[in-house]
Curated annotation (Swiss-Prot):
It comes from the Bacteria. Belongs to the Lgt family. It comes from Paracidovorax citrulli (strain AAC00-1) (Acidovorax citrulli). One of its GO terms (molecular function) is phosphatidylglycerol-prolipoprotein diacylglyceryl transferase activity. It is found in: Cell inner membrane. The gene is lgt. This is Phosphatidylglycerol--prolipoprotein diacylglyceryl transferase. Pathway: Protein modification; lipoprotein biosynthesis (diacylglyceryl transfer). It is an enzyme of class 2 (transferase). The lineage of its organism: Bacteria, Pseudomonadati, Pseudomonadota, Betaproteobacteria, Burkholderiales. Keywords: Cell inner membrane, Cell membrane, Membrane, Transferase, Transmembrane, Transmembrane helix. Catalyzes the transfer of the diacylglyceryl group from phosphatidylglycerol to the sulfhydryl group of the N-terminal cysteine of a prolipoprotein, the first step in the formation of mature lipoproteins. Its EC number is 2.5.1.145. The chain crosses the membrane at residues 17-37, 63-83, 95-115, 182-202, 209-229, 243-263.
């Protein structure tokens, strides 16, 4: 059994300026996206596109900018609508109180999809081509986010058997019983493992939509599994069929991914 190592959320204090670890994890996520996106330009079909359809570093920068907007706006609206709709309908101005916390991955995903559709239309490119480009670059950002969750001592797991060697006590949870370090589980599954699988899968030229579909199915399945070890939101608890809100939101994600993959496989090879 391990004790959560209290980590000061402020990485560096320079006078009145406080640099938080969580902010640094976001910075790392953006940097990793730029690095991987630049590498992705060498993969087919992007490497062989020419003229107006050619992909450049400027495209990667624009996608990152739009993606950040999609994550912030979609993530916040998703949290308000999926997790506390009644409260935020009664207190609509608090939707803008982002500093109070409350972001949803699934809402952020919808925001990113919307921003990618806009990017594709503005560049006169198939939006699935854009989605396939982005998908393998996302998991490292998710991994960085889970590091931030762990440093902040938030989103801890459910109670575990005291004999579990890596069971961890999170004093901030209000209990001294060991829990699953679910942030670490999600870092490994939704971050590192999903990245390796998607990156290897995307190295070969695929039918349009296949890589994006693999991301939807892969993330949905890994998140669904991780939710069994993660403490549900206190104000929601466990919902019908013994599933958490996160699991219920993963179901349509997995179904959409499977349908997209089946559709993509039926398209002629490029």
């Amino acid at each position: 059994m391990l004790m959560y190592p209290h980590i000061d959320p402020i990485a560096l204090q320079i006078g009145p300026l406080a640099i938080h670890w969580y902010g640094l994890t976001y910075l790392a996520a953006f940097g990793l996206f730029m690095f991987l996106g630049t590498r992705r330009l060498r993969h087919e079909p992007y490497a062989s596109l020419t003229g107006a359809q050619a992909w450049t570093r400027k495209d990667v920068e624009d996608i990152l900018f739009l993606g950040v907007l999609g994550v912030v706006v979609g993530g916040r609206l998703g949290y308000c609508l999926f997790y506390k709709p009644g409260y935020y309908l009664s207190h609509p101005l608090e939707i803008f109180y982002i500093w109070q916390g409350g972001m949803s991955f699934h809402g952020g995903l919808l925001g990113v999809i919307a921003s990618m559709v806009w990017f594709a239309r503005s560049r006169h490119r198939p939006w699935l081509q854009v989605a396939d480009f982005v998908a393998p670059c996302v998991p490292t950002g998710l991994a960085a986010g889970r590091v931030g969750n762990f440093i902040n001592g938030e989103l801890w797991g459910r109670f575990c058997d005291p004999s579990l060697p890596w069971g961890m006590v999170f004093p901030q949870s209000g209990s001294m019983l060991p829990r699953h370090p679910s942030q670490v589980y999600q870092f490994l599954m939704e971050g590192l493992l999903l990245f390796v699988l998607l990156w290897l899968y995307a190295r070969r030229e695929r039918r349009q939509g296949e890589v994006a579909a693999a991301f939807l199915v892969g993330y949905g399945c890994f998140r669904f599994i991780a939710e069994y070890f993660r403490e549900p939101d206190a104000f929601l608890g466990i919902l019908s069929l013994g599933m958490s809100m996160g699991q219920w939101l993963c179901v349509p994600m997995i179904v959409a991914g499977v349908l997209l993959w089946v559709w993509a496989r039926r398209q002629p090879a490029r």
